[in-house]
Amino acid sequence: MAKQFLIVGANSSIGKEVFTLLSKDGHEVFTTSRGSFDNPGRHFITEDLSSFDEMEGLPNSLDGLLYCPGTINLKSIQRLQIDDLLADLEVNFFGAFHALKGLLPKLKNEDGGSVVFITTVAANVGMPMHGSISAAKSALQGFAISMGAELAPRVAVNCVAPSLTNTPMAEFLLNSETKIQASEDRHPLKKIGNPTSIAKTIELLMHAKDHGITGQTFNIDSGLSTLKA
C-alpha cells in the first residue's frame, strides 16, 4: 500500500537516494530543502527550519519523516567558538526538533508513523577535531531515544549513524586517492560510506513502525564504532 513520506533536506546526497527508492516503490514523497528539487507539486523551499508547523500543502497525515540536514565543521578546541557550536546545533539538532514537533500531529494521525534522524559515528566514537559536530549529533541521538519512549506506540523513532561518506559535503576530506585510501584503511571493512547503501537502510527504517523497530541507532560505518581489526 502506498504511503506518504516527507524528506527534509532532500537535495542532500542521501536524501536524493532515499527519495528515489521510496518513489520507485510507489510512495508519495514530499520534500523540502533550501533550494530547488525535481519533485513537481510536492517540493517546498524552506529557509527557516523552525516553521514546519506552518507548511501548507502537506497531507493531513504522514507515514514517515526523514531529517537529513547536517554539517561537517572540524576544528580543534583552541579554534572552536560558541558560534560554531550554536551553528551546528541549529542545523543538526534544533532543526530536527522543530521538524518533529511541527509535524507530529500529522505523524500521529491514522496508524502513526516512523521518524529517522541522520547522526554520525562521531557521536559514538571519540575523534579529534569533531567536538562540535559530535556534541550536536549526540544531542540528536539522545533526543531520538527519548522521543522513541515518549511517542510509543504511535510513532517509531530511530537514527542512522554513518561514518565518513562519499558526498559533496565531505569532498574536502576525500579529494585525493591518498586521502580515500587512508580513510578506507581506518575502517575494519576497508570501505567508506556511500549514499546508496545508507539510503537502503533508511528506506527500511521509514517503515520501522511496521517492523517493530524503535529507539535504535544503526551504525553504518564498516565496523568503525565497534570493531578493532
Predicted features and spans:
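N-terminal Rossmann NAD(P)H-binding glycine-rich loop of SDR-like oxidoreductase domains
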Residues: 11, 15-19
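Substrate-binding pocket helix/loop in short-chain dehydrogenase/reductase
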Residues: 76-77, 81-89, 183
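Alpha-helical segment proximal to the catalytic Tyr-Lys
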Residues: 105, 148-153, 211
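Catalytic loop of short-chain dehydrogenase/reductase
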Residues: 114-139, 144-152, 164-165
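Short, flexible catalytic-loop segment of classical short-chain dehydrogenase/reductase
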Residues: 161-172
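A conserved structural motif in NAD(P)-dependent oxidoreductases
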Residues: 187-198
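Short C-terminal tail/terminal secondary-structure segment
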Residues: 214-229
